[in-house]
Amino acid sequence: MHIFDELKERGLIFQTTDEEALRKALEEGQVSYYTGYDPTADSLHLGHLVAILTSRRLQLAGHKPYALVGGATGLIGDPSFKDAERSLQTKDTVDGWVKSIQGQLSRFLDFENGENKAVMVNNYDWFGSISFIDFLRDIGKYFTVNYMMSKESVKKRIETGISYTEFAYQIMQGYDFFVLNQDHNVTLQIGGSDQWGNMTAGTELLRRKADKTGHVITVPLITDATGKKFGKSEGNAVWLNPEKTSPYEMYQFWMNVMDADAVRFLKIFTFLSLDEIEDIRKQFEAAPHERLAQKVLAREVVTLVHGEEAYKEALNITEQLFAGNIKNLSVKELKQGLRGVPNYQVQADENNNIVELLVSSGIVNSKRQAREDVQNGAIYVNGDRIQELDYVLSDADKLENELTVIRRGKKKYFVLTY
């Protein structure tokens, strides 16, 4: 299958410039293309993965990727469809984020092998040395204010106010495309659908300043079956950095995907063939309660982002916590699996009687409730049911001398640390 058709079949093309010309270019030989990543945090998140994996698919088809990290544009801030002005960051902060993001991209693109190995670029390399006068004379003169204000991303901000700093952002992104075309013969840009206005500013600059044709592919902004923006868990972004979102948390995110989204997400976020995904779809629809599509999705994406060992660890944590086998997990695994649950620091001189601890830690509101829970068998210490009111936690209950896991009922976990 032609790479363009495969991208379409997987639901990865939202909008393009001249589709016929782009398809022809991809058929006739190697195309150099780029995707830009502005450092707005110290990590990329799942929302970025759609463009990253689209870039990887094109590389696997023989085309040459350039990964542009916006050391300059990250200092300015993209206004596209944002309700308010971004806070400006210091150069040191942005530089640190650039390095983090460059490291993450190397997991997905091949920067080492073949004539189409990926190339990392930073737009601070050309913007850092250009003077304001040169910027206005050599770039700004090709953009009319009418053209710039016609962009939907700008229109939405006119009423609330937009600074000249952010207004000029589209010119900067347009110039990125121009520089990469002149220096590396890059003719295609890939980005999110919210970037269409900025990306076509690049094709316009290429046409007017160099009489060349540039192409654009936008990938869709992914939403779930309810229309909710994809890539957040409990309102928080799902990060690619394991220190910010653990492999276990990412695994759980994919396992909780709705049935209506699971097969579609397999096409977007995995490298399984379309035939393999069709087989999974048939099995999944025959027995949706077995959640085959979610299991495969979680396995493939966690392995892709964090590696096979991290996936196996996340799966083991899931299985042991479900079975209540707390003692089968290391403290490191428990910290990953129980991140975000209520945590209570036990003082050295504290009364370690189970009833007293349940109240002092805030697990229950009263001694009466604590006694009822214990007597009714609703309290577990490290997976073991405790029904004695006079039970006192000992050193044996301190896993690796660091923590104790309390469970109340079937699912409510609490961690005591020492």
From Swiss-Prot:
MF (Gene Ontology): ATP binding; RNA binding; tyrosine-tRNA ligase activity
Class of enzymatic activity (EC top level): ligase
Keyword annotations of the record: Aminoacyl-tRNA synthetase, ATP-binding, Cytoplasm, Ligase, Nucleotide-binding, Protein biosynthesis, RNA-binding
SUPFAM superfamilies xrefs: Alpha-L RNA-binding motif, Nucleotidylyl transferase
Subcellular locations according to the entry: Cytoplasm
GO process terms (BP): tRNA aminoacylation; tyrosyl-tRNA aminoacylation
Any GO CC annotation of this UniProt entry: cytosol
ATP-binding keyword on record: yes
Residue numbers covered by motif 'HIGH' region: 39-48
Residues involved in L-tyrosine binding: Y34, Y169, Q173
Coiled-coil intervals: none
Sequence ranges assigned to domain S4 RNA-binding in this UniProt record: 352-418
Pfam family, any one: tRNA-synt_1b
Keyword Transit peptide: no
Intervals of motif 'KMSKS' region: 229-233
Family statement: Belongs to the class-I aminoacyl-tRNA synthetase family. TyrS type 1 subfamily.
Self-association state and partner proteins as the record states: Homodimer.
Purpose of the protein: Catalyzes the attachment of tyrosine to tRNA(Tyr) in a two-step reaction: tyrosine is first activated by ATP to form Tyr-AMP and then transferred to the acceptor end of tRNA(Tyr).
Stored HAMAP family: Tyr_tRNA_synth_type1
This protein's name: Tyrosine--tRNA ligase
Organism: Streptococcus pneumoniae (strain ATCC BAA-255 / R6)
Classification of source organism: Bacteria, Bacillati, Bacillota, Bacilli, Lactobacillales
